[in-house]
Amino acid sequence: MNSVLITGAGYRIRKRGDVLTIETGKDSDTAEPPRTLSPLGLDLLAIAGDHSISTAAVRLVTSHGGAIALMDGLGNPFGHFLPLGRSALIEQYEAQASAPEERRLEIARSICTGALENKRTLLSNLERIRGFDLSREIRLVEDAQDKALECQSLDSLRGVEGSGAHAYFQGFSLAFDEEWGFLGRSQNPATDPVNSLLSYGYGMLYIQARQALVLSGYSPYYGAYHETYKKQEALVYDLVEEFRQPVVDRTVVTFLAKHMATPDDFTYPDEGGCMIGTMAKKKYAAAVLTRIHGKVKYEEQTFQDIFKRQAERIGKALTEGDEYVPYRYRT
């Protein structure tokens, strides 16, 4: 899938002859020389942020079989221009939606075992650095990994993954002092500061996963492990699973261990739940973004790059039957 991403703000995308021109608008603070882009072989033009595009430019891209994705400044897609008739993007969506159940189950097993492996790795890291005895929790997560490989249905797989996640959060809770009130995972609403940070961080991961999938030419909706219902973006949730521990959970541990927030930075509204204060939220969001955009140990890439790689892998696994190899967290 040949895709081009335009980010920032204020660019004007126009048709000039048989090519597209991309230039800064009249009100832009910085003038840049115009750039040209050929529509030949272009499968997807992704436009993120506030820009303008002419109908002639839309017609030029779509007449060559390409699609245009419109995204907000955070990378959330909100619309597409698609060519009439067949196109590479439409065919890829159809192949994704019609993936056989056996293939989906195989991919789902890989997603679960990869996610459980990354949970085990973070627990082992906490045990080594903090001196906790997490042997029981690690063993339970490993048992869940072994059982996941034998599951013959998505329902049984979800049950096994749930038991492994429960054991993981029992061990993970030891990383926090009693003042944080964290006893395990809770959401909708989060009941304590740690859960509030986890949920907010996972939301940031969804944005990364969604953008990576759209740029790779895959629909966020047709997944393998999670169900598609009520407009839930199943493939986004699938892709996020293996990144929760290495990106968000690890950041939460470091963020609170460095005293970058206190319990007073969180509020408890009358309607229930726990909310992050404005200043703490800014600091925490910056910490998560630093993690996402920083180089990953043992990899010559950032997590943002790895998201793109894994999006292409999971998409090919669904549409072409390739083996899905999840990201393995190493410390």
UniProtKB/Swiss-Prot annotation:
InterPro entries registered for this protein in UniProt: Cas1, CRISPR-assoc_Cas1, CRISPR-assoc_Cas1_C, CRISPR-assoc_Cas1_N
Q: Which cofactors are named for this entry? A: Mg(2+); Mn(2+)
Q: Which Pfam families match?
A: Cas_Cas1 (PF01867)
| Top-level EC class as recorded in UniProt | hydrolase
What do we know about how this protein assembles, alone or with others?
Homodimer, forms a heterotetramer with a Cas2 homodimer.
> What is this protein's function?
CRISPR (clustered regularly interspaced short palindromic repeat), is an adaptive immune system that provides protection against mobile genetic elements (viruses, transposable elements and conjugative plasmids). CRISPR clusters contain spacers, sequences complementary to antecedent mobile elements, and target invading nucleic acids. CRISPR clusters are transcribed and processed into CRISPR RNA (crRNA). Acts as a dsDNA endonuclease. Involved in the integration of spacer DNA into the CRISPR cassette.
NCBIfam families in the record: cas1
Which protein are we looking at? Answer: CRISPR-associated endonuclease Cas1 1
UniProt organism field: Methanospirillum hungatei JF-1 (strain ATCC 27890 / DSM 864 / NBRC 100397 / JF-1)
Gene encoding this polypeptide? Answer: cas1-1
